Amino acid sequence: MPRVKRGVTARARHKKVLKLAKGYYGARSRTYRVAKQAVTKAGQYAYRDRRQKKRQFRQLWIARINAASRQNGLSYSRFINGLKKASIEIDRKILADIAVFDKVVFATLVEKAKEALAK
């Protein structure tokens, strides 16, 4: 078997890593060894945060719904329970949007929840 020299593949791999590290500060964008570590770490953060993003948005929506429902005299948990009893199925993302941009509609939803809880 002939000897395989890896210069071409090594150069391609180095170029790929340095391209991914473009825009990083200092040696992280210029030196292969440091850039490789930075790109790997960035990938780990990206993987982790794609999952955390979902949790964080749900927390934000719940906080907004809680604030708006308390302004209308009902806690978050009782509001959600009331909506379930009234068989109103609106997800938290849309509820948070309504709470921020359409307070009148949100107030009517709170009233419906209160009526369902009273029954």
Swiss-Prot record:
Q: Name one GO molecular function term.
A: rRNA binding
InterPro entries for the chain? Ribosomal_bL20 (IPR005813), RIBOSOMAL_L20_CS (IPR049946), Ribosomal_protein_bL20_C (IPR035566)
Q: Which domain of life is it from?
A: Bacteria
Q: Which Gene3D superfamilies match?
A: 6.10.160.10, Ribosomal protein L20 (1.10.1900.20)
**Any one of the GO CC terms:** ribonucleoprotein complex
Q: Which residues form a coiled coil?
A: none
List GO BP terms, alphabetically.
ribosomal large subunit assembly; translation
**Alphabetically ordered keywords of this record:** Ribonucleoprotein, Ribosomal protein, RNA-binding, rRNA-binding
Kindly give the CDD domains that the UniProt entry links to this protein.
Ribosomal_L20
Protein family (similarity comment) = Belongs to the bacterial ribosomal protein bL20 family.
PANTHER family assigned? 39S RIBOSOMAL PROTEIN L20
Q: What does this protein do?
A: Binds directly to 23S ribosomal RNA and is necessary for the in vitro assembly process of the 50S ribosomal subunit. It is not involved in the protein synthesizing functions of that subunit.
Q: What is this protein called?
A: Large ribosomal subunit protein bL20
